[in-house]
Amino acid sequence: MSKQVFEMIFAGKKLVVETGQVAKQANGSVVVRYGDSTVLTAAVMSKKMSTGDFFPLQVNYEEKMYAAGKFPGGFNKREGRPSTDATLTARLIDRPIRPMFAEGFRNEVQVINTVLSFDENASAPMAAMFGSSLALSISDIPFNGPIAGVQVAYVDGNFIINPTAQEQEASALELTVAGTKEAINMVESGAKELSEEIMLEALLKGHEAVCELIAFQEEIVTAIGKEKAEVELLQVDPELQAEIIATHNIALQAAVQVEEKKAREAATEAVKEVVIGEYEARYAEHEEYDRIMRDVAEILEQMEHAEVRRLITEDKIRPDGRRVDEIRPLDAEIDFLPQVHGSGLFTRGQTQALSVLTLAPMGEAQIIDGLTPEYKKRFMHHYNFPQYSVGETGRYGAAGRREIGHGALGERALEQVLPSLEEFPYAIRLVAEVLESNGSSSQASICAGTLALMAGGVPIKAPVAGIAMGLISDGTNYTVLTDIQGLEDHFGDMDFKVAGTREGITALQMDIKIEGITPQILEEALAQAKKARFEILDVLHGAIAEPRPQLAPTAPKIDMIKIDVDKIKVVIGKGGETIDKIIAETGVKIDIDEEGNVSIFSSDQAAIDRTKDIIASLVREAKVGEVYHAKVVRIEKFGAFVNLFDKTDALVHISEIAWTRTANVADVLEIGEEVDVKVIKIDDKGRVDASMKALLPRPPKADNPKKES
């Protein structure tokens, strides 16, 4: 296929798609140019079905540092493991694409997005999401798309699609919404306490823009799309399915209705073991033994899936006996740990999270050096999910994509209420340890994080609570669930997480397993989540009503002063000489950022105060009109030089010493003498002129009678 180019203007920028020139051996590939951002997307599919019991989809988002004209860090000077932002972007693309493959599809699919050039004012992640959908859609991979995604900002009451970096900085909303032509199927958002009404409007505005991009993709698919390949889907033997349902469904239904999680798991597992044992014995010598046993396992999974959904939609009974809008029992506790800077333990049913706060100087802030300009990240929220939290063994090691994603969601929810750096000059780290899990552990970590921050004396603007909403839909009727547990998440159609304060929403995240949900469902879920959020906030308030007025005794003491940017070099000195001398004299630790924020850290408040005085004197500047108690340091015929403070001298001209004529400066002043002077002028070279006579009363003018003519 020869090179073909398609263009449109989207959100004020040119969107260009090129195909047929590069990566032609992939099942589908496109180059997407949006503004000056360029992303190559290649989609490939294995020829055979995988043997696992899940769809092996892998989505990568690879940031090449050359895209921003930068060298990679590190000794090897080449890209290593994906950054946190790249990992989150890969998840962002994966989530709306995954539901668009047929049930039972098991061929391995890889979608690789490579950022080739980067423009911070033209979203490379959204170009990659567009490219991922389009590469799949024009390929022979059986993808039921297209989908698309956009970013939405909210500035001065107006919604902006795919904002520039400057617009996003001014925005009260950072929203990514994706979906099909018919409905939304993925949401990721942080917000500055916005109402449910504004959030819903933002979602709908975003979906309108998504539909524009999908229409563009459909034009391209019509022009160059390949015929879809015929692939084998995982389908069970219908006769075997009917037989197992007839003989074992009643027992499985009873097991599913056991209310306590571990007991329910044991009961369902016992039923499954009986069925599997029966068919293992019957077909042990059969030539298709592996396929039959795979079908048996899949049928049992489908039976459990169907029963959970039937109970909720028809009988309005949840697996643990709750109403559809009922939250599990709640408990909140602070000060679970000694010595640490703050801790909170939050329990919701069989989900429990411990959050631990650590405060440090800004020098400990994380340096982010990606495609965007380097910056310091002050607040970190890390989420850990050990396997013992669900009573299982498993892999232990570096955080995976899920843990990174859940940590980022909690970070977005809580950072909206943090005090400014000027109000609270600390780097802040929260670590959420999930101790038990039966669904909604990410939202439990947000609640525990609120407790830890308040217990640690961080003056947050308001407490934040989170809740996870679910959905069971048969295409015609639906039920929205409050506070979903693990089984409802696993067998349900939606996981919609909402976090916020009493004033509004601070974070949203939605993933669905069906192709999309309607505005009506979104509105109902948001309203139900608000009611639940307020109920949880009441429990948090019962544990701690407001942030403590002081930090923990173990927390570091930090103070901050602001200096002019051009004074940074004065405080640091040549080769760091000045700042090293201050540190040696006072024993403090000092961090200075490029904006002139000076953080002083010590366990001794007196040392901090002494350091502030030293720095203040170093950066002090004379000001016209101010009066100083100065010392004469040099005498010349034309006047005297006086030291105002530190290394700042001023000239008192001979005419500014007194109102009467001064014949000889040395007759009036001597070196070492202390005098009061007023600054009357500072020239463009920084030279200071001062006056003594300006502080003296002006003598009356002598009478000067007119001469007679």
From Swiss-Prot:
GO terms for cellular component: cytosol. Residues 556-615 form the KH domain. The keyword NADP does not apply. Gene3D superfamilies: GHMP Kinase, N-terminal domain, K Homology domain, type 1, Nucleic acid-binding proteins. It catalyses: RNA(n+1) + phosphate = RNA(n) + a ribonucleoside 5'-diphosphate. GO terms for molecular function: 3'-5'-RNA exonuclease activity; magnesium ion binding; polyribonucleotide nucleotidyltransferase activity; RNA binding. GO terms for biological process: mRNA catabolic process; RNA processing. It is found in: Cytoplasm. Pfam families: KH_1, PNPase, RNase_PH, RNase_PH_C, S1. The keyword Transferase applies. Its EC number is 2.7.7.8. It comes from the Bacteria. Residues 625-693 form the S1 motif domain. InterPro entries: ExoRNase_PH_dom1, ExoRNase_PH_dom2, ExoRNase_PH_dom2_sf, KH_dom, KH_dom_type_1, KH_dom_type_1_sf, NA-bd_OB-fold, PNPase. Keywords: Cytoplasm, Magnesium, Metal-binding, Nucleotidyltransferase, RNA-binding, Transferase. Its cofactor is Mg(2+). Mg(2+) binds at D489, D495. Involved in mRNA degradation. Catalyzes the phosphorolysis of single-stranded polyribonucleotides processively in the 3'- to 5'-direction. Belongs to the polyribonucleotide nucleotidyltransferase family. PANTHER family: POLYRIBONUCLEOTIDE NUCLEOTIDYLTRANSFERASE, POLYRIBONUCLEOTIDE NUCLEOTIDYLTRANSFERASE 1, MITOCHONDRIAL. This is Polyribonucleotide nucleotidyltransferase. It comes from Streptococcus agalactiae serotype Ia (strain ATCC 27591 / A909 / CDC SS700).
